A protein has these predicted regions:
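N-terminal core-binding DNA-recognition domain of tyrosine recombinases/integrases
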Residues: 14-107
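Conserved tyrosine-mediated DNA breakage-rejoining catalytic core shared by Y-recombinases
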Residues: 151-191
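A short, glycine-centered helix-capping/turn motif at helix boundaries
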Residues: 138-151, 242-247, 286-289
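Long, amphipathic, Lys/Arg-enriched alpha-helical "connector/arm" segment
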Residues: 100-131, 137-144, 152-155
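Active-site/catalytic core of tyrosine-dependent DNA strand-transfer enzymes
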Residues: 181-245
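Short functional hotspots where side chains directly engage DNA or cofactors
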Residues: 163-168, 261-300
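C-terminal/domain-terminus segments
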Residues: 54-58, 187-197, 294-300
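Short basic/aromatic active-site micro-motif
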Residues: 224-276, 288
Length: 300
């Protein structure tokens, strides 16, 4: 492996990622990590690229073949392909990666979960850091992603009956509006806005996002929570019941499949329509663009 060419290629990655508009800190870090892995893999395969501009379609095929032999999951391979397509756009090389993954014989991704990942019960008082506790509670109550819950500026986001999530706080730089739908959310906002000065996020003034993220990870470890994404799953599942209860004139609603309810295919008539409408709303509220993603949170 040519160290000088590898360093040069890594520098070109840093420069490219640094100048991407609309990407959050986490999205840029993820992009940088994955592109560096691609370049290292290519060097190990004998392609000593010194710059991202040197990427060609044959290199993409080489990477896909390598990932398959390494046993990488379909989801992981598709994630890499999405990053490489973005590189093609940024470098004005639209032919670098073909538009469809079928061209590379990549299997279709399955969104079917094997178990319920929701964290419905946890004692937030076990968190000794008040800012991190607020972040965790916001994930549970509003379905926020980790980065969103840390960068949240409550005084700016809370607009009466809704919470406006700014693009700069989100994955992919796409903002969204969340309606306040219950008293627990409103009580939390009232409590939180009294604790946090106007204009301040849930990051201490003397720390960067990266520094605070490290502290956050230590705190959730002490709470014996390995991954807090389950708080977001819990939000989606509560919201599914809440929405279908609103659609149901009897107020009974539906339990999502992953929590013991009927699958979408088993539902009949109007109940199937409730399921579709609820999934569309939840997909938007979670910051996703595809309804299929809700299978991860709700089952199918």
């Amino acid at each position: 492996m040519s160290k000088s060419k590898l360093k040069s290629a890594q520098y070109s990655i840093n420069e490219l990622v640094k100048n991407i508009k609309g990407y959050s800190f986490a999205s840029k870090a993820d992009m940088r990590h994955m592109l560096n892995r691609c370049i290292k893999d290519l060097h190990e395969q004998g392609y000593k690229l010194g710059h991202l501009n040197g990427l060609k379609p044959k290199h993409i095929h080489t990477l896909v073949d390598l990932w398959k032999t390494q046993g990488k999951s379909t989801a992981t391979i598709k994630n890499y392909m999405a990053k490489l397509r973005k590189v093609g756009v940024l470098l004005d090389k639209p032919q670098l990666v073909k538009s469809g993954n079928d061209n590379y014989q990549i299997n279709r991704r399955s969104y079917v979960p094997t178990y319920n990942k929701a964290i419905h019960q946890t004692d937030f008082s076990n968190c000794s850091d008040p800012l991190i506790r607020l972040s965790l509670e916001s994930q549970f109550l509003f379905g926020l992603r980790r980065e969103e819950s840390i960068k949240l500026i409550i005084s700016e986001a809370w607009q009466g009956n809704c919470l406006r999530i700014q693009p700069s706080w989100t994955k992919g730089g796409i903002g969204r509006t969340l309606n306040i739908t219950n008293e627990e959310q409103r009580q939390w906002l009232t409590k939180a806005i009294q604790q946090i000065p106007a204009g301040q996020s849930l990051i201490p003034k003397n720390k960067t996002y990266k520094q605070h993220l490290g502290h956050y990870q230590k705190q959730i470890k002490l709470m014996e929570l390995s991954k807090c994404h389950g708080l977001r799953h819990a939000y989606a599942q509560r919201r599914y019941l809440e929405l279908t209860q609103q659609f149901d004139s009897n107020g009974k609603g539906l339990t999502c499949p992953i929590d013991g309810g009927l699958s979408s295919r088993q539902l009949k008539g109007i109940e199937r329509e409730w399921d579709r409408r609820a999934r569309e709303i939840i997909s938007r509220e979670l910051g996703h663009s595809r309804i299929a993603i809700t299978k991860i949170y709700l089952g199918c």
